[in-house]
Amino acid sequence: MFKVFGALSGKGSSDSNGNSTRSSINEKRTKLILKEANDFEIALRAMDYVLDDRTEEGLALLRENEKVNGQNQTITVLARGVIEFLQATLSFEMEEIKNASNTLAKAEQLSWKSRTEAQKSGIRNSSIYPPGTVYAVTYTESCLLHALLMLFTESMMDAAKALLKLRKAYSMLHEIMEVVKKSELSRKVSSSSAVSIQSNGSFVSEEATFVSADIPYQLSETESNDPELWAFAEKIYKMRKLRLSGAHIGNTPAISRLRSGLGLSASNKSEELANSEQSVLSDEAAERQATIDEFIHSGVNLCYGILQVVLSLIPPAIGAVLSIVGFRGSREEGLRLIWKATKDRNVHGCIGLLGLMFYYDGPFQFTDVDFDIPPALSNTKTSDSDTDRDGSISIDEMDGHALLHPGPILEEALLHARALFPNSALWLLNEARMLSSRGRLPEAIELLDSIDVESIHMRQVKGLLVFDKAITLVHMQEYERAATNLLSLLKISDWSHAFYTYFAGCCYLENWRMAQMGFIKDDKLEFYREKAEELIFSAPKLLGKKTFKSKNLPLDRFMLRKVEQFKATQKKLGVKNILDAIGTSPIREITYFYNGYNRMSKSDLEIAQKMLTSYHNPAIDQHDPDQELIKNLLLSLTMRRLGDVESGVKLLDEKVLPSIYYMQNGKVKYIKKTEDPWAYPTALYERALFTWKLDGVDNLSECRHWLVTAQNYAGDYELSTRVGMKIKAALDRVEESLQHGTA
């Protein structure tokens, strides 16, 4: 495309028939601009096929385009890279990470070349942004996604390279963001259709007039009456219109599937909406928006937003270094930008929504439901967020509290995605996660059971869905079913066969204990015992056989340490049955890692409390200080979730915290322990939550004290990243509230 840009910009043209030459050049320029918009629409369509669990159709579409344009077209290579990035981040498998990294590296190079050539030519493909802007966006998108993949490998060399890429992306995104902000202001000033007609390409015939948003200038009289140009421009308009309605990948218009709420029992929207073929699931002005402009601002919002959120969650030791070299992340600004990206009906909006759902409702849940700190001080104690309960707050109006508790806005966005991509289990999985985060566990399982796992084409999504189903079943204490699902992952996913096996063994162990306690029938008691022993103690043998990293995963290292502890306890006590050498239930620990205590029902919490306090074996009865610490930590937060906050904090203060720190001359002194390193900063984090539940905003300064104390319990241990990010997210919310309250 760019080989002819020099001629199209008027450089080097000296034809004696000036007007004819100019007309010919203008027509070629217009055709190329339309072709570029067409290629972007094809790429957007291909990526949407993947989001509808039809990866092969998406890749086939890209291959067809490559037959015409070759294998070095920037947007096609980026689209392939985005598809491979999604596959890699859903599976975390090394081979897929390598493939995606190679493709994104190529997309970076092509984007830089395309941007440079577009700037030299001076030809505008946008009425809003300067030449080359769209390729600045493809460059930063390639950089950002590539850097994230590098960080996933946990290689020191790759991490250093990733920081350089993030720096490049950060600098360019900041520059583009300023252009985007200026364009948004100018659009607010002049957004009338009359202006649009004058500034965009208008085609005229005796019967009709058609305005193409994709041509950012007025057409000559010859072009305006060119039927070939008209047909091409109208084709792109129709492609965009079909994409906005969700009908571009062969599905009926998405509005016909839009439901009123979560879960299988939710009804569809009104017949009137369902029968409207013209309805779209985005802004009314979207059809009149140029494809290139849409790609630019949605891409910038997504990439800059993700970068800001990631930087805001980085532990302080690394964050301090990054801030010195110019990196600064704002969680609130980042979330707001990602929310803006979701307004666009394209892959950027979908990736943004997936990121938001992981942030709000994912297994780790960075916004702890027990820590619902508002963005500013008030005189009220904690209460459930009433932000946007009627769905009346728009994304543009979201303040700090709404960003923390998006409520119906997030639900509505997910329901739109479910309607747009009815064939994809990825969106069904996220709906189940949302139900689970709201404590609607049986409905989540019902939804997950509604799809035949074997019908899912994307192996990565299949693995995620089965794992999430297992976690949800664990929260419901249906351990045998959970174990069956976990073991089935050995044939689906290469992520960590060792942890899957250990996790399944812990499920059988808890069933064995519950059968002994009379919570379930004891007719399979011996089966549970045999399976627990077999799986827990065979898991370490699987390390390194099915892992995507050069070193063991954090949960692999956690599992290995626990198994070694059990063996050491058996040797110390001399017990014949090795299961009697296991103290505090390991499944209760894993339940905490996946946010189970915030999701369990009252009856399941009561069973958990009973199992923690009333089950006995030789390992438990020796009252080992380390096992007692974990038991009392888990018991205290179980009590808090059951509403007995006073008893919970008393237990934590008296039985847990004295083993972790003490005060000396007004300063915190840590008791460094290594037996279960995740538990020590976690206990301090949970103490901050207790203060919040007891005193609300009246004692946010003490909340901050506990969170700072937790954060400063520094150490590189197997789950330090997960625990550290959770602590930092809470500390940021507390500090924001304190700052706003004293302003």
Swiss-Prot record:
Biased composition (Low complexity): 10-24
Domain of life: Eukaryota
UniProtKB keywords: Cytoplasm, Nucleus, Phosphoprotein
Subcellular location: Cytoplasm; Nucleus
GO term, biological process aspect, one: cellular response to misfolded protein
Xref: InterPro entries: EF_Hand_1_Ca_BS, Iml2/TPR_39, TPR-like_helical_dom_sf
GO cellular component, one term: mitochondrial outer membrane
Keyword Disulfide bond attributed: no
Main location: cytoplasm
Region Disordered, annotated ranges: 1-25
Family listed: Belongs to the IML2 family.
Subunit structure as annotated in this protein's UniProt entry: Interacts with lipid droplet proteins.
Role according to the record: Inclusion body (IB) resident protein that interacts strongly with lipid droplet (LD) proteins. Involved in LD-mediated IB clearing after protein folding stress, probably by enabling access to the IBs of an LD-stored soluble sterol derivative that acts as a chaperone in inclusion clearing.
Full protein name: Inclusion body clearance protein IML2
Originating species: Candida glabrata (strain ATCC 2001 / BCRC 20586 / JCM 3761 / NBRC 0622 / NRRL Y-65 / CBS 138)
Lineage: Eukaryota, Fungi, Dikarya, Ascomycota, Saccharomycotina
